[in-house]
Amino acid sequence: MPEDEQRSSLRGWLSRVRASFKGAGDVVETGGRGEGAVHLSKALPRFFAAMQTRPAPVLLDLGPVIGGNVTLLGDSLGCKVYIDNIFGDPRRASHDRRETEDCSGLGVDLRHPDDSIDGVLCWDVFEHLSQAAATKLVLNLARIMKPGGIGMAIFATELAPHPQFVKYSMIDPQHLRHRLVPAAAAQPRVWTSRDVQLLLTSFVADESYLLTHQQRETLFHKPVAAGHRPRA
């Protein structure tokens, strides 16, 4: 399928799944970016809906292990989840290690087979990487994701007031709770909309949502080459 048709098809699919998870239940949203803040996600329900169209999808979570997330993903999607926490313990991740152009100390190599991952969750990742490390991570994502695979990334649009990482706990397929973890060094950068576009040149950016709590959620997919047939 030509890329323009593929992109149009995926956008049409995204519009059809907007109501896939109706009703917020008893979840109460809170404002701000403080500890325990709860926010409605625009991209997460679309990511869930995308994975529900795939039999036994394989997911990669680039954040720390959060038992509730693994349980919700497994129960909702019947999927296999790999956890690659590329920073390890953020309280020990040094500023020099994250800012250096040498990526050898980071887990950005992603030791997974080519074309093996259906979906990727990129939580509090890119804000803490140098340009070189972020680029290397994206290239490795392009290698390991299946053609048509879907990714969700969150980017902060302003610097955090204190050195911290954010753990994202999924309350349901619509809501995320923010858990703040002290970090060894301050967040070195933010990514503008233009920065994100340039970073994801290996992918097709499908939708981007600028949220009121100074975050941008982005959905992207790996292009499907002409004549490509999914593996059995």
Regions found by a protein language model. Give the residues of each.
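Class I (Rossmann-like) S-adenosyl-L-methionine-dependent methyltransferase catalytic domain
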Residues: 2-51, 59, 66-111, 150-232
